[in-house]
């Protein structure tokens, strides 16, 4: 049984259509159609992975048109016994963007002791149909301190999106309900147990490191990480140093005290 049921995705949590937009035919409203995608699923087998995810699965696109990714719901389930240690960070990525901090759309962190979790991300931007057909979205997964033998699947993730498909790039006439988005950067929804770690290593830094490590051509646009700055500011810790601190953090038994209720 899927973790996310299509009928349970509430469009009103992301957008608020006027009465006329709900009643009039599509030809009389700026909105061509509001759609909910089919479920796309990823089985996570590696501690660190960057995988493509189809956020528009089952969505009928318009040739020469646009699609607006209003929001998405991500559900996860740990395939582990109860009270296991460790945790995971999940980050949504737009692979077109070369700067890691601009590529990260939203991220979420949780402990393995919380068997099921669900969160929403509000990207709230549009792309062309041509770009959409290239499957531009990815998910970066980083599992920490989950001791499972290689070849098995500790975590399952499922994705459902709410989007608007339209022909002309005109004002949509929607009042978006956007929550928890900071002007200074992408949205990050955090579990208390890893707040201290994530303040030092945002997911954009992890993405930059993963891209550099995976690329045969070497680093491209992230070669300024870790350089000192003038003005007496302290030199930031390296990613490896903070990751070691995180390993020690999630070893702590207090990790199992994460709230067991699903929340956005």
From Swiss-Prot:
Pfam families on file = MP
Its GO biological process annotations read: transport of virus in host, cell to cell
Which GO molecular-function terms appear in the entry? RNA binding
Q: Which family does it belong to?
A: Belongs to the tobamovirus movement protein family.
As recorded in Swiss-Prot or TrEMBL, the protein's gene is named: MP
Q: State whether it acts alone or in a complex, and with which partners, per the record.
A: Binds to host RBCS at the plasmodesmata; this interaction seems required for viral systemic movement. In resistant plants, interacts with host MBP2C at host microtubules; this interaction prevents virus cell to cell movement. In resistant plants, interacts with host resistance (R) protein (e.g. tomato ToMV resistance protein TM-2(2), AC Q71BG9) at the host plasma membrane; this interaction triggers host defense responses leading to programmed cell death.
**Protein's recorded name:** Movement protein
Q: Output the superkingdom of the source species.
A: Viruses
May I have one GO cellular component term? Answer: host cell cytoplasm
Sorted alphabetically, which keywords does the UniProt record give? Host cell junction, Host cytoplasm, Host cytoskeleton, RNA-binding, Transport, Viral movement protein
| Ligase keyword on record | no
Biased composition range(s): Acidic residues: 241-255
């Amino acid at each position: 049984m899927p973790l996310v049921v299509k009928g349970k995705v509430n469009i009103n949590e992301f957008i608020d259509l006027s009465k006329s937009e709900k009643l009039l035919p599509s030809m009389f409203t700026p909105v061509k159609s509001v759609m909910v995608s089919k479920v796309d699923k990823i089985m996570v087998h590696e501690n660190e992975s960057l995988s493509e995810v189809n956020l528009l699965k089952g969505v009928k696109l318009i040739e020469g048109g646009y699609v607006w990714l209003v929001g998405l719901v991500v559900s996860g389930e740990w395939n582990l016994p109860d009270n296991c240690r460790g945790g995971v960070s999940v980050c949504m990525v737009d692979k077109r963007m070369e700067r890691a901090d601009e590529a990260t759309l939203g991220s979420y962190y949780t402990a393995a002791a919380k068997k099921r979790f669900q969160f929403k991300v509000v990207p709230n931007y549009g792309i062309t149909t041509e770009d959409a057909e290239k499957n531009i979205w990815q998910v970066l997964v980083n599992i920490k301190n989950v001791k499972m033998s290689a070849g098995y699947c500790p975590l399952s993730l499922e994705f459902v999106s709410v989007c608007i498909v339209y022909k002309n790039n005109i004002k949509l006439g929607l009042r978006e309900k956007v929550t928890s988005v900071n002007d200074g950067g992408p949205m990050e929804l955090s579990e208390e147990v890893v707040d201290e770690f994530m303040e030092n290593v945002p997911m954009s830094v992890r993405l930059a490191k993963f891209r550099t490590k995976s690329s045969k051509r070497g680093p491209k646009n992230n070669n300024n990480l870790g350089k000192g700055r003038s003005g007496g500011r302290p030199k930031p810790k390296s990613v490896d140093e903070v990751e070691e601190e995180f390993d020690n953090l999630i070893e702590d038994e207090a990790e199992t005290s994460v709230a067991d209720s699903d929340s956005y």
